[in-house]
Amino acid sequence: MVNQKRFLDNFILVEYNNLSYPEGYTAQIQEVAAHFDKDVIDPQRAYSMHTEYSYGKRKYNTELISKYPALIAASKNGVPQLWKSAEWASEFADFIVDLVSGHSVPTIIEIHPPFNDYCSLAGFVDRFRIFENKIHEAYPDVIIVIENRAGSVYHGGRFLVGKAKEIVALCDLIKSEALNLGVVLDFPQLLTAENIDPLKFKTEKYQSAIQTIAEHRDLIKGIHIWGKKKSATGRWVAHAGNFDTYFGGND
Protein backbone atom coordinates (compact mmCIF):
# COMPACT_ATOMS: atom_id res chain seq x y z
CA MET A 1 0.00 0.00 0.00
CA VAL A 2 1.38 3.42 -0.98
CA ASN A 3 2.08 5.79 1.91
CA GLN A 4 -0.11 8.77 0.95
CA LYS A 5 1.97 11.33 2.84
CA ARG A 6 5.27 10.22 1.34
CA PHE A 7 3.66 10.06 -2.12
CA LEU A 8 2.25 13.59 -2.00
CA ASP A 9 5.49 14.99 -0.59
CA ASN A 10 7.07 14.38 -3.99
CA PHE A 11 4.83 16.87 -5.78
CA ILE A 12 4.08 20.56 -6.17
CA LEU A 13 0.31 20.38 -5.85
CA VAL A 14 -2.03 22.08 -8.32
CA GLU A 15 -5.60 23.02 -7.42
CA TYR A 16 -8.22 21.88 -9.91
CA ASN A 17 -11.72 23.38 -9.93
CA ASN A 18 -11.56 24.50 -6.28
CA LEU A 19 -11.16 20.90 -5.07
CA SER A 20 -9.03 20.34 -1.97
CA TYR A 21 -6.25 17.91 -1.10
CA PRO A 22 -6.18 15.73 2.04
CA GLU A 23 -5.78 17.47 5.38
CA GLY A 24 -2.30 18.86 5.83
CA TYR A 25 -1.74 19.59 2.13
CA THR A 26 -2.31 22.87 0.31
CA ALA A 27 -2.05 23.48 -3.42
CA GLN A 28 0.73 25.86 -4.36
CA ILE A 29 -0.53 26.50 -7.89
CA GLN A 30 -4.05 27.14 -9.21
CA GLU A 31 -5.23 25.75 -12.54
CA VAL A 32 -6.94 28.48 -14.58
CA ALA A 33 -9.18 27.69 -17.56
CA ALA A 34 -7.93 29.41 -20.72
CA HIS A 35 -9.91 27.81 -23.56
CA PHE A 36 -11.20 29.68 -26.59
CA ASP A 37 -14.54 30.69 -25.04
CA LYS A 38 -12.79 32.43 -22.14
CA ASP A 39 -12.30 36.17 -22.33
CA VAL A 40 -11.25 36.79 -18.72
CA ILE A 41 -9.27 34.94 -16.06
CA ASP A 42 -9.11 35.51 -12.31
CA PRO A 43 -5.99 33.90 -10.83
CA GLN A 44 -5.72 34.19 -7.07
CA ARG A 45 -2.09 33.05 -6.78
CA ALA A 46 0.60 31.37 -8.86
CA TYR A 47 -1.24 29.65 -11.68
CA SER A 48 -1.14 27.21 -14.56
CA MET A 49 -3.06 28.14 -17.72
CA HIS A 50 -5.00 25.17 -19.05
CA THR A 51 -5.40 26.19 -22.67
CA GLU A 52 -7.81 24.92 -25.33
CA TYR A 53 -8.00 21.10 -25.27
CA SER A 54 -10.53 20.37 -28.04
CA TYR A 55 -12.87 17.99 -26.29
CA GLY A 56 -16.05 19.60 -27.60
CA LYS A 57 -17.52 22.48 -29.55
CA ARG A 58 -16.75 26.13 -28.85
CA LYS A 59 -19.02 29.11 -29.45
CA TYR A 60 -16.28 31.52 -30.62
CA ASN A 61 -18.50 34.42 -29.62
CA THR A 62 -16.34 36.54 -27.31
CA GLU A 63 -14.88 39.91 -28.21
CA LEU A 64 -11.42 38.52 -27.45
CA ILE A 65 -11.53 35.56 -29.84
CA SER A 66 -13.00 37.77 -32.59
CA LYS A 67 -9.55 39.37 -32.90
CA TYR A 68 -8.06 36.07 -34.07
CA PRO A 69 -9.49 34.87 -37.41
CA ALA A 70 -7.02 31.98 -37.80
CA LEU A 71 -8.16 30.50 -34.48
CA ILE A 72 -11.81 30.80 -35.47
CA ALA A 73 -11.24 29.38 -38.97
CA ALA A 74 -9.42 26.32 -37.59
CA SER A 75 -12.56 24.53 -36.49
CA LYS A 76 -14.44 21.46 -37.66
CA ASN A 77 -18.09 21.34 -36.67
CA GLY A 78 -17.24 23.72 -33.84
CA VAL A 79 -14.34 21.68 -32.42
CA PRO A 80 -11.03 23.59 -32.41
CA GLN A 81 -8.33 22.19 -34.69
CA LEU A 82 -5.23 22.91 -32.67
CA TRP A 83 -1.95 23.76 -34.44
CA LYS A 84 -3.68 23.97 -37.83
CA SER A 85 -1.16 26.41 -39.36
CA ALA A 86 1.72 28.78 -38.71
CA GLU A 87 -0.79 31.63 -38.50
CA TRP A 88 -2.75 29.65 -35.92
CA ALA A 89 0.34 29.19 -33.75
CA SER A 90 1.15 32.90 -33.87
CA GLU A 91 -2.42 33.93 -33.02
CA PHE A 92 -2.58 31.33 -30.25
CA ALA A 93 0.36 32.99 -28.52
CA ASP A 94 -1.25 36.41 -28.95
CA PHE A 95 -4.55 35.10 -27.55
CA ILE A 96 -2.80 33.89 -24.39
CA VAL A 97 -0.91 37.16 -23.94
CA ASP A 98 -4.19 39.07 -24.35
CA LEU A 99 -5.93 36.83 -21.82
CA VAL A 100 -3.13 37.30 -19.29
CA SER A 101 -3.02 41.08 -19.73
CA GLY A 102 -3.52 42.85 -16.40
CA HIS A 103 -2.63 39.77 -14.35
CA SER A 104 0.55 38.25 -13.01
CA VAL A 105 2.62 36.13 -15.37
CA PRO A 106 1.58 32.44 -15.39
CA THR A 107 3.93 29.89 -13.90
CA ILE A 108 2.90 27.20 -16.39
CA ILE A 109 1.17 27.16 -19.77
CA GLU A 110 -0.33 23.77 -20.62
CA ILE A 111 -0.99 23.06 -24.28
CA HIS A 112 -2.50 20.07 -26.09
CA PRO A 113 -1.74 18.13 -29.27
CA PRO A 114 -3.41 18.50 -32.67
CA PHE A 115 -5.51 15.87 -34.40
CA ASN A 116 -3.72 13.55 -36.80
CA ASP A 117 -5.91 14.18 -39.86
CA TYR A 118 -4.23 17.51 -40.62
CA CYS A 119 -0.97 17.68 -38.64
CA SER A 120 2.12 15.48 -38.22
CA LEU A 121 4.62 15.57 -35.37
CA ALA A 122 7.06 17.43 -37.63
CA GLY A 123 4.36 19.96 -38.48
CA PHE A 124 3.54 20.40 -34.81
CA VAL A 125 7.21 21.05 -33.99
CA ASP A 126 7.45 23.75 -36.68
CA ARG A 127 4.30 25.49 -35.44
CA PHE A 128 5.22 25.09 -31.79
CA ARG A 129 8.49 26.97 -32.40
CA ILE A 130 6.50 29.99 -33.61
CA PHE A 131 4.30 29.85 -30.53
CA GLU A 132 7.16 29.24 -28.10
CA ASN A 133 9.24 32.13 -29.44
CA LYS A 134 6.39 34.60 -28.94
CA ILE A 135 5.43 33.25 -25.52
CA HIS A 136 8.98 33.32 -24.17
CA GLU A 137 9.48 36.79 -25.58
CA ALA A 138 6.53 37.86 -23.41
CA TYR A 139 7.23 35.56 -20.44
CA PRO A 140 10.87 34.38 -20.44
CA ASP A 141 10.50 32.14 -17.38
CA VAL A 142 7.16 30.47 -18.04
CA ILE A 143 7.17 26.66 -18.25
CA ILE A 144 5.39 25.23 -21.31
CA VAL A 145 4.10 21.66 -21.11
CA ILE A 146 1.99 19.46 -23.37
CA GLU A 147 -0.56 16.93 -22.12
CA ASN A 148 -1.30 13.60 -23.78
CA ARG A 149 -4.94 13.53 -24.91
CA ALA A 150 -7.63 10.97 -25.63
CA GLY A 151 -11.33 11.56 -26.09
CA SER A 152 -13.16 14.17 -28.13
CA VAL A 153 -16.36 14.63 -30.12
CA TYR A 154 -14.13 15.45 -33.12
CA HIS A 155 -14.62 13.32 -36.24
CA GLY A 156 -12.00 12.59 -38.89
CA GLY A 157 -8.93 11.97 -36.77
CA ARG A 158 -7.67 11.39 -33.26
CA PHE A 159 -5.18 13.20 -31.07
CA LEU A 160 -1.63 12.97 -32.38
CA VAL A 161 -0.18 12.30 -28.92
CA GLY A 162 -2.18 9.84 -26.84
CA LYS A 163 -0.65 6.36 -26.77
CA ALA A 164 2.63 5.54 -25.02
CA LYS A 165 4.51 5.11 -28.30
CA GLU A 166 3.23 8.51 -29.48
CA ILE A 167 4.36 10.18 -26.26
CA VAL A 168 7.80 8.62 -26.79
CA ALA A 169 7.92 9.81 -30.42
CA LEU A 170 7.16 13.34 -29.24
CA CYS A 171 9.80 13.12 -26.49
CA ASP A 172 12.37 11.97 -29.04
CA LEU A 173 11.60 15.06 -31.14
CA ILE A 174 11.68 17.37 -28.12
CA LYS A 175 15.23 16.17 -27.44
CA SER A 176 16.49 16.03 -31.02
CA GLU A 177 15.04 19.45 -31.83
CA ALA A 178 16.03 20.94 -28.44
CA LEU A 179 12.49 22.21 -27.85
CA ASN A 180 11.72 24.17 -24.71
CA LEU A 181 8.78 21.90 -23.92
CA GLY A 182 7.95 19.44 -21.17
CA VAL A 183 5.27 16.75 -20.87
CA VAL A 184 2.39 16.41 -18.44
CA LEU A 185 1.45 12.74 -18.27
CA ASP A 186 -2.29 12.23 -17.82
CA PHE A 187 -2.73 8.67 -16.54
CA PRO A 188 -6.51 8.25 -17.12
CA GLN A 189 -6.18 9.52 -20.69
CA LEU A 190 -3.25 7.15 -21.24
CA LEU A 191 -5.50 4.27 -20.15
CA THR A 192 -8.15 5.41 -22.62
CA ALA A 193 -5.67 5.74 -25.49
CA GLU A 194 -4.21 2.30 -24.75
CA ASN A 195 -7.70 0.72 -24.47
CA ILE A 196 -7.08 -0.39 -20.90
CA ASP A 197 -10.45 -0.98 -19.23
CA PRO A 198 -10.26 0.24 -15.60
CA LEU A 199 -12.93 -2.30 -14.60
CA LYS A 200 -10.95 -5.15 -16.21
CA PHE A 201 -7.53 -3.76 -15.44
CA LYS A 202 -4.63 -5.51 -17.18
CA THR A 203 -1.52 -4.83 -15.11
CA GLU A 204 0.88 -6.16 -17.74
CA LYS A 205 -0.50 -3.89 -20.46
CA TYR A 206 -0.34 -0.88 -18.15
CA GLN A 207 3.22 -1.65 -17.06
CA SER A 208 4.28 -2.06 -20.67
CA ALA A 209 2.92 1.41 -21.51
CA ILE A 210 4.65 3.01 -18.53
CA GLN A 211 7.95 1.26 -19.23
CA THR A 212 7.79 2.54 -22.80
CA ILE A 213 7.61 6.12 -21.51
CA ALA A 214 10.03 5.69 -18.58
CA GLU A 215 13.17 6.37 -20.62
CA HIS A 216 11.95 9.95 -21.03
CA ARG A 217 11.08 10.55 -17.38
CA ASP A 218 13.35 13.62 -17.44
CA LEU A 219 10.80 15.35 -19.70
CA ILE A 220 7.82 14.51 -17.48
CA LYS A 221 7.20 17.77 -15.62
CA GLY A 222 3.86 16.84 -14.08
CA ILE A 223 1.17 14.18 -13.85
CA HIS A 224 -2.62 14.20 -13.85
CA ILE A 225 -4.42 11.65 -11.69
CA TRP A 226 -8.19 11.87 -11.32
CA GLY A 227 -11.22 9.70 -10.74
CA LYS A 228 -14.19 8.78 -12.88
CA LYS A 229 -17.66 7.52 -12.17
CA LYS A 230 -20.54 6.33 -14.29
CA SER A 231 -23.63 8.44 -14.76
CA ALA A 232 -27.20 7.14 -14.44
CA THR A 233 -27.05 6.26 -18.15
CA GLY A 234 -23.79 4.32 -17.75
CA ARG A 235 -21.56 6.95 -19.35
CA TRP A 236 -18.17 7.61 -17.77
CA VAL A 237 -17.90 11.11 -16.24
CA ALA A 238 -14.36 12.46 -16.04
CA HIS A 239 -12.99 14.39 -13.05
CA ALA A 240 -15.67 12.91 -10.82
CA GLY A 241 -15.90 10.14 -8.27
CA ASN A 242 -12.66 8.60 -7.05
CA PHE A 243 -10.39 5.61 -7.67
CA ASP A 244 -12.96 3.26 -6.12
CA THR A 245 -15.60 4.28 -8.66
CA TYR A 246 -13.02 4.36 -11.48
CA PHE A 247 -11.53 0.92 -10.85
CA GLY A 248 -14.63 -0.71 -9.40
CA GLY A 249 -13.12 -1.06 -5.94
CA ASN A 250 -10.34 -3.33 -7.22
CA ASP A 251 -6.92 -3.05 -5.56
Question: What is each stretch, according to the model?
Answer:
Residues 58-66, 121, 154-162, 194-204, ...:
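Short, flexible/disordered intra-domain loops and linkers
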Residues 1-10, 42, 75, 90-107, ...:
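Histidine-acidic metal/acid-base catalytic patches
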Residues 14-19, 33-35, 50-56, 114-116, ...:
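Active-site beta-loop-alpha junctions enriched in small/polar residues
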Residues 66-182:
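Active-site acidic/histidine proton-transfer and metal-coordination neighborhood
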Residues 37, 172-174, 211-213:
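Short, flexible, glycine/charge-rich loop motifs used to bind or transfer phosphoryl groups or to couple energy/partner
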Residues 27-34, 48, 110, 145, ...:
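Conserved beta-strand positions in the central sheet of alpha/beta enzyme cores
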Residues 1-90, 94:
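N-terminal pre-domain/capping segments
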Residues 3, 20-23, 81, 117, ...:
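N-terminal start-of-chain detector that recognizes signal peptides
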